[in-house]
């Protein structure tokens, strides 16, 4: 398959997996997400090996990293993020890769600290975060669904 065909196939599989997820068919969805990741991974590595250039290469690695992140394969997600940043991605893609890296790092740290709390164990907390730490705050808000006042 060509790079474009692999990428298209990966996105179709991910879309099917999303649909299954909405139906509560988690095991079937996970299987499709894994197949999607394999296709996107192959597309990304083919793109890099064939040196098709930017932004295509970094976008494919970002996509593969997102799929790995969704599957909670944080180490694999980190690898794809690094591969995407190792090229010469456009600034916006590099920014997205770094934001995804922040999310992956947070998840890995929480996993290592065994802090995955059940939904019903959330509580109200007030914190002050310096302006330069806003990206971390965004990650925390997305992860935990926190309400924030800026």
Model-derived segments and spans:
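Helical anchoring/docking segments at protein termini
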Residues: 1, 112-150
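Flexible helix-coil transition and linker loops at the boundaries of alpha-helical arrays
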Residues: 1-3, 42-54, 87-94
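Hydrophobic/aromatic side-chain positions at a characteristic register within alpha-helices
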Residues: 2, 14, 21, 28, ...
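Residues that mark the junctions of alpha-helical repeat units in TPR/alpha-solenoid scaffolds
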Residues: 2, 9, 28-29, 36, ...
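TPR repeat positional signature
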Residues: 6, 13, 20, 60-61, ...
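Residue position in alpha-helical solenoids
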Residues: 19-20, 39-42, 46-47, 67, ...
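Helix-turn-helix repeat elements of alpha-solenoid scaffolds
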Residues: 29-42, 74-76
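Alpha-helical linker/edge segments of TPR/alpha-solenoid repeat scaffolds
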Residues: 52-74, 100-123
């Amino acid at each position: 398959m060509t790079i474009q065909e692999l990428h298209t196939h990966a996105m179709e599989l991910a879309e099917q997996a999303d649909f299954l997820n909405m139906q509560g068919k988690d095991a079937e969805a996970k299987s499709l997400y894994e197949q999607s990741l394999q296709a996107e991974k192959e597309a990304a590595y083919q793109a890099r090996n064939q040196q098709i250039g930017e932004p295509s290469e970094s976008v494919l690695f970002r996509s593969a990293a997102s799929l790995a992140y969704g599957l909670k394969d944080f180490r694999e997600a980190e690898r794809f993020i690094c591969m995407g940043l190792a090229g010469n991605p456009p600034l916006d893609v590099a920014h997205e890769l770094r934001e995804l890296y922040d999310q992956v790092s947070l998840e890995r740290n929480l996993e290592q600290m065994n802090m995955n709390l059940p939904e019903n164990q959330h509580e109200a907390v007030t914190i002050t975060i310096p302006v330069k730490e806003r990206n971390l705050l965004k990650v925390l808000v997305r992860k935990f669904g926190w309400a924030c006042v800026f």
